[in-house]
Amino acid sequence: MLRGLRIIAENKIGVLRDLTTIIAEEGGNITFAQTFLIKHGEHEGKALIYFEIEGGDFEKILERVKTFDYIIEIEEEESFERVFGKRVIILGGGALVSQVAIGAISEADRHNLRGERISVDTMPVVGEEEIAEAVKAVSRLHRAEVLVLAGGIMGGKITEEVKKLRKSGIRVISLSMFGSVPDVADVVISDPVMAGTLAVMHISEKAKFDLDRVKGRRI
């Protein structure tokens, strides 16, 4: 069973070492971790640490962590998988990104009403270097399942990053556009709204659409 643990602590050296040591000693396996400094509010300047832990004695972990004097808050949370679910990422030119988002959000709404959890992330971005960096970063995004690239022309460094991303297991949908990106994407779709819809259908556990069945095709 996966359980989330949110901690607010003083920003000091050794905190992560102490916490991960306790989790390991109590038999817990950390499947996801993130930490950042809080920029606003009552805990400004403090560290927010979040773990998703599989197995182990969770209650004992809580009990031991609470003993540290640098711990300000500690609370069990639902995992990101339960709250936000699988993620569709949409990158590219603003106007086309918004059209893809219409399809993706409308389809995700249908599935989420039935108990699934699918979220849609969008970022309008232009320029070869900028888009290439964004594509590269998708592999580091927790729970990202499929990327939709929306634009009029994409190639060069973007194409190379798309190739690498696909090797990591993340599917890539390209709108019909100029450049070499459509040649290396899993599928090319001419209608942006349909692209968003099919992206969500692919990662849904209840829909019957599978990108692997149309890989290499233009729709």
From Swiss-Prot:
Record-linked PROSITE patterns: ACT
Domain of life: Archaea
Protein known as: Uncharacterized protein AF_1403
Domain ACT: 4-79
Any Pfam family the entry gives: ACT_AHAS_ss
Native organism: Archaeoglobus fulgidus (strain ATCC 49558 / DSM 4304 / JCM 9628 / NBRC 100126 / VC-16)
